Design a protein with these regions (language model features):
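Membrane-proximal intracellular helices of multi-pass ion channels
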Residues: 1-172
Length: 172
């Protein structure tokens, strides 16, 4: 279903009738999101590619310690600073998703529903997996938290985090 990875939020089928494995694939696509430069939410395909290549290089480095490895994206070498930036973004992204899942699980919902709600709101996807009731099953507080998650996800985390830095509010 292209609506999941493109984050258009429009679906014509009832996903709850699909096999569970298919729902998990859609959940994975919710986290990856759209392409770089698009207005789609999510972690972005390019960042997922960089993470996969970093993991591959680290595995090869442990197997062949004397081998010199570089990471190439579209024919050009990706410097270490950019790689570290993507890894830091992944850490913040995972921390926020885990925090959302933890808070939303206080509503005593199924883990698939809670994880789907966290991914759907933070990545601005739209559909909710595991239930046909949509977001009506969540408490008002959870809906408020998911609203903030939508804003944080749309802004790609960092601009929102800047609001909490004391340097942002100093008059220097």
């Amino acid at each position: 279903m292209s609506t999941i990875i493109t984050t258009t939020g429009f679906g014509l089928t009832d996903i709850t009738k699909w096999p569970l494995f298919s729902q998990y694939i859609l959940l994975l696509l919710m986290f990856i999101g759209g392409s770089a430069g698009s207005t789609a939410g999510g972690f972005k395909v390019i960042r997922a590619m960089i993470i996969a290549k970093i993991a591959r290089n680290q595995t090869l480095a442990s197997l062949y310690p004397n081998r010199i490895l570089s990471l190439h994206i579209n024919g050009s070498v990706l410097d270490k600073e950019t790689q570290h930036s993507v890894l830091k973004y992944l850490a913040v992204y995972v921390l926020i998703i885990l925090s959302l899942v933890t808070v939303l699980s206080l509503d005593n919902q199924d883990l698939l529903i809670v994880t789907s709600a966290a991914a759907s709101t933070f990545n601005n996807i739209g559909p909710l997996l595991g239930t046909s009731d949509s977001f009506a099953i969540f408490s008002p507080l959870s809906k408020l938290i998911m609203g903030f998650a939508m804003i944080a996800g749309r802004l790609e985390i960092y601009p929102l985090l800047l609001l909490f830095l004391p340097k942002t509010w100093s008059k220097t």
